[in-house]
């Protein structure tokens, strides 16, 4: 189904070449101050055309809020927001209409539903994440307004180039809010949203792939700062399980890890366990190998998450596919321009999914009143 | 909450040192032939004491089915199964009663619920996965009986030692059912459930860690063989999202990947995309880099999943913690014997979660009738 | 929350005086032929101003479909439909802004959410049932297209005047589809949607109440014809429980009954039980006292439901209330014109809720494929 | 499915002649003091054999709690409770094995699931309400402990005999807690759980039906006292909708009403609307025609609900049915003794469902902390 969350629920709808795309947000308590601009800002961060590594289609993605906000505040009723599609010009699809693109969900959708929207992936297009970002913008506002929680994302690896900036190289850095604000500015001013010193090297790597008519993936790190202790549930409705499901639900994601993640498989127990100590009146972990979550529940340390993003499947190179009508092998050449890398544009989407997950579990864990704040 | 699944639902209950642990399975269609023995066999696979790397507590874990099966077949009503705890002798907990164990959820539970079951982790104990395995055994039977789907798991890495057997080194191997049966036998006869040639080296690695009073993690690969094309949903209720949530919900899991996973971040689009070709009358992928899932929906190729398991947090070494009464730093020494590695025992649990997820989505995708088979 | 249904889900949003109202329909299988006109027709049936007993505000309620339908058929993706509000002129609310209207949810909303939309009830307005009707129109089409199921509603009582036409007076009548078509025409041509011979008497009753600046209630009967045997579930997700929840969810409904309903409390078991007999090759009930449902599951006989509708709470008479600012008792006089009876306008809304419920349970019971038809 | 509730969830399982029946309660916050005896007392109220109007099968219905309670308090983990079946002697079912009983769900289950438990209805038996009562007992304790809410039920009509005691004849009576305690005692000492002066007349009416080998229905009123203002939600997850779904989910229930219910259809708006006035510092309704709920949300007045209970379908009279093997009409005579009326035994079940619903919505409305109290 197209709904994410149990107590703070986001239902998204819309196709890449339909009339509009949007989301209905249900379960946001009343009295949250929020404006259309707050949400528009987040939409602008994922909009195409914002850097050299993004398709130059200059979609405006202008938000309209149709319900749920009255006199500048949420009312407790569902918030409906949408973006009308503009400039989705009817181009010539005849070449690819019956030839599913490798790496895309075209064939899958066709076999499952008996139809697919050949005009650009329909519901499987990355464009549908507009709904995620609308929902995420409200969730971000809610958790920041009530608990001063910040969510920040950046790339730590592009293709084969490792960056030099990640949480575990800089744990103390993340203890200061002003550091985080400076970091955010740095990220937003970088075309790869990468705060590493060697980001120019990464840039060249992507430019080189563009020359080869190819595409590139990467790794994104998401930090959730300020989440109180106790958010999440044991067993099945875990904080990490919900975050994992949220992130893996983004089509390009092929891997997910928390804290030390895959590296933890190589450590001894005595290396991995975070020792406790008294820090003034509260109990803290000396390290944060666990990434801020144990047994489904937040520890109070920053939550550290990483995802692997596959290279964009749309490439200009000729690829091998089949023709669905003739049932014969057929080469396919996807015209137009494509994002050579979607890592930077996925970042606000992952931040949105993190925000929705945290808002949802903070309501169900009793940290945010479900009716009004 | 303690329920997993939407259409095939497993609700687990019970604590490590309570009277019993169990599961209620709701949504299994009627007419599935199943016996207590089928379920008991799976429970035996996760039972402690089955190898040198598992605690010698010889819990019997004897299953009782109390409802939902009549005259050897499911009836369509909820299946309630449980295991009474035996031999959970009341030992002396006074030393650790007020000192949360690092790496465990003790402190988290205490801060969240205002209580914790100091007798062995209560609900956060690995022992609660008995419920997962009861549910998984029914799900395995359902998907094997109706669609001949097989789920097989094994370790591919122990501590720092990489194995030489995994799906990508042997893709053709997995095309034969008799190969899979032989593989299963090999796995079950190995104390680390590792089919690699160098498993003795891994064994030594674990024995060495035991000598050091330490513990070891590893990586597990789970293959789902025979899943038809079209299982799963776009956007939020994706096959990969549900599997991710299911696996990450197991306490020791710190990372999850599908297909090429984290490696995909290093590939070019032209390397990662699986080309299509006509194989007799059906469309197949030349490779399976995507791991059998695109856009939330199964492609018909084997589903390939990998998880990272952290080292067991219970170790005999002295560790640093705090006393919850005195609010002072305190060393903790956890007595008794512990599993130096839980990787092999987690395998049947992950297989169970995979089976429940697949059963659930096959019902909601219309592959298995929700009422009767 | 604002979502109804589990497998066929309708999420409604919007307020009476907001920018727009609408619904997102999730879980409708692909390939259902449907047009905007199909949905518009149902919206027209609940639109104000269609008879002398309805407010003369001539809202156009023009539907727009923004997603989920491609080339005249559903695609399996969420269907988003909405109606922009027009002519909700900003009138002078100063008199009633702080004085909750008796019989309305104004006070309740204010105390719960700390705000209320004084411009006409906001989310508690009957106008929000536009979303229900959009969802219901799709559901009606789905169950009619796949199983030829018809849902028909009419009033059987207006105020104190009992009608002479209901299911139990005419059980054989409902066995013919052409009878049902004629009945539908008769209902739609009657301002009270009442097929009884004495409907003129009822009309006078309402006119008399209008003269007294008062309002009138009534009883509605809903028949679901053609529902196959086996729809619904035992215990908690029952056909009757879901229908009851759906109907009671409409604000004006204060009572709900199935089959003989409250009358069944007066019968002996030997009178109430429907005997079985062989009718050609199938087993039928001689009577249908149970109203087509036993134990949560449809019997194959027509489903017979009745609801009690309270008189419209908006009346022109002076009423007693309190001022929320001064905390003093205050009289309130609600200006403008109001529906003296909403019974006829509630009928398409109840039909919609019945259709959504039946569609939802037919999918979860395996009668309609969840992916494509 | 077999789960009721969203935030306070009760999953019931078990069949009338299986090994055991029980419930898993998920979402009860930690720190609620509760004993097995608290739950056993409620089970005793619904146990057969407690009066002359109940089958003399003296099932002990001895409760066992297997998880979720530690040192006399809930722990926040799932509470698993069950009752082992005893003395379900294997009697001779050969006469009725293939002949579905009129008024029961036998035929329905058989056609839906391809099997039915001929030994006494299996999952459709009233005996499965043991699970409801286990869940309800915990919910009652939770809402009484945290908010002093009382739920009380009694019969107001037996067969054709109207009682003289109901809420609307005695609204002031219900304002005193000591009155309610006295009322409860009177109810529990009456074999029909009827506090009316003419209950002896009702008793004779049932005895007369027993002589005729027939059965009798009735009407039950349930009062929820002390529920705070604001519980419930607009639109679909309404307090009245949830209560309706909960009550209609009990097999014998054929009608449900709130407040004036069906009578409200006969009233004018000016009669039905409850006027507001200032009562010291709070706003109260002068009357409670609405039954304590408007627009999905509690008003703070007592919640008044009524249900119609059909006569017990099991009667000793010869009835007409069909043989499922021979497909011929066949008479059926159901041997053994049966409850001539189940109205009094249904009362604790309805109270349980009311308690679960209120607990669930108080958690989701922010009145009860979801984690710990």
Swiss-Prot record, chains A, B, C, D:
<feature type="binding site">
    <location>
        <position position="295"/>
    </location>
    <ligand>
        <name>FMN</name>
    </ligand>
</feature>
<keyword id="KW-0274">FAD</keyword>
<dbReference type="InterPro" id="IPR020541">
    <property type="entry name" value="Chorismate_synthase_CS"/>
</dbReference>
<keyword id="KW-0456">Lyase</keyword>
<keyword id="KW-0288">FMN</keyword>
<dbReference type="GO" id="GO:0004107">
    <property type="term" value="F:chorismate synthase activity"/>
</dbReference>
<dbReference type="GO" id="GO:0009423">
    <property type="term" value="P:chorismate biosynthetic process"/>
</dbReference>
<keyword id="KW-0521">NADP</keyword>
<comment type="function">
    <text>This reaction introduces a second double bond into the aromatic ring system.</text>
</comment>
<keyword id="KW-0057">Aromatic amino acid biosynthesis</keyword>
<feature type="binding site">
    <location>
        <position position="46"/>
    </location>
    <ligand>
        <name>NADP(+)</name>
    </ligand>
</feature>
<keyword id="KW-0028">Amino-acid biosynthesis</keyword>
<feature type="binding site">
    <location>
        <begin position="251"/>
        <end position="252"/>
    </location>
    <ligand>
        <name>FMN</name>
    </ligand>
</feature>
<protein>
    <recommendedName>
        <fullName>Chorismate synthase</fullName>
        <ecNumber>4.2.3.5</ecNumber>
    </recommendedName>
</protein>
<dbReference type="GO" id="GO:0008652">
    <property type="term" value="P:amino acid biosynthetic process"/>
</dbReference>
<comment type="similarity">
    <text>Belongs to the chorismate synthase family.</text>
</comment>
<dbReference type="GO" id="GO:0009073">
    <property type="term" value="P:aromatic amino acid family biosynthetic process"/>
</dbReference>
<feature type="binding site">
    <location>
        <begin position="310"/>
        <end position="314"/>
    </location>
    <ligand>
        <name>FMN</name>
    </ligand>
</feature>
<dbReference type="GO" id="GO:0010181">
    <property type="term" value="F:FMN binding"/>
</dbReference>
<keyword id="KW-0285">Flavoprotein</keyword>
<dbReference type="InterPro" id="IPR000453">
    <property type="entry name" value="Chorismate_synth"/>
</dbReference>
<comment type="pathway">
    <text>Metabolic intermediate biosynthesis; chorismate biosynthesis; chorismate from D-erythrose 4-phosphate and phosphoenolpyruvate: step 7/7.</text>
</comment>
<feature type="binding site">
    <location>
        <position position="337"/>
    </location>
    <ligand>
        <name>FMN</name>
    </ligand>
</feature>
<dbReference type="GO" id="GO:0005829">
    <property type="term" value="C:cytosol"/>
</dbReference>
<dbReference type="Pfam" id="PF01264">
    <property type="entry name" value="Chorismate_synt"/>
</dbReference>
<feature type="binding site">
    <location>
        <begin position="123"/>
        <end position="125"/>
    </location>
    <ligand>
        <name>FMN</name>
    </ligand>
</feature>
<dbReference type="InterPro" id="IPR035904">
    <property type="entry name" value="Chorismate_synth_AroC_sf"/>
</dbReference>
């Amino acid at each position: 189904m197209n709904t994410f969350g149990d107590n703070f629920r986001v239902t998204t709808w819309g196709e890449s070449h339909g009339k509009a795309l949007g989301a209905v947000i249900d379960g946001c308590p009343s009295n949250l101050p929020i404006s259309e601009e707050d949400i528009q800002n987040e939409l602008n961060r994922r909009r195409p055309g914002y850097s050299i590594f993004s398709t130059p289609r200059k979609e405006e993605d202008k938000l309209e809020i149709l319900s749920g906000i009255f006199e500048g505040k949420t009312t407790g009723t569902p918030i409906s927001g949408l973006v009308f599609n503009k400039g989705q010009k009817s181009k010539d699809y005849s070449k690819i209409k019956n030839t599913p693109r490798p790496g895309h969900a075209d064939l899958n959708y066709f076999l499952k539903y008996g139809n697919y929207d050949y005009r650009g992936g329909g519901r499987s297009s990355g464009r549908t994440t507009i709904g995620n970002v609308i929902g995420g913008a409200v969730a971000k506002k809610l958790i920041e307004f009530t608990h001063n929680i910040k969510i920040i994302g950046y790339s730590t690896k592009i293709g084969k180039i490792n960056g030099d900036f990640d949480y575990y190289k800089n744990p103390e850095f993340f203890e200061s809010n002003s550091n985080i604000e400076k970091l955010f500015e740095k990220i937003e001013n970088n075309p790869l949203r990468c705060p590493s010193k060697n980001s120019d090297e990464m840039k060249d790597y992507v430019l080189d792939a563009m020359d080869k008519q190819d595409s590139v993936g990467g790794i994104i790190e998401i930090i959730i700062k300020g989440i109180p202790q106790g958010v999440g549930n044991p067993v099945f409705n875990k904080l990490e399980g919900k975050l994992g499901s949220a992130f893996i639900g983004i089509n390009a994601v092929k891997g997910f890890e928390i804290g030390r993640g895959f590296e933890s498989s190589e450590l001894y127990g005595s290396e991995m366990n975070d020792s406790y100590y008294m820090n003034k009146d509260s109990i803290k972990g000396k390290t944060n190998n666990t990434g801020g979550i144990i047994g489904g529940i937040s520890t109070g340390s920053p939550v550290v998450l990483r995802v692997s993003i596959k290279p964009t499947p749309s490439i200009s190179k000729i690829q091998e596919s089949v023709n669905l009508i003739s049932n014969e092998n057929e080469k396919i050449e996807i015209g137009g321009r494509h994002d050579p890398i979607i890592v930077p544009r996925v970042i606000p989407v992952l931040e949105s999914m993190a925000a929705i997950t945290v808002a949802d579990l903070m309501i169900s864990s009793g940290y945010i009143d479900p009716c009004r704040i």
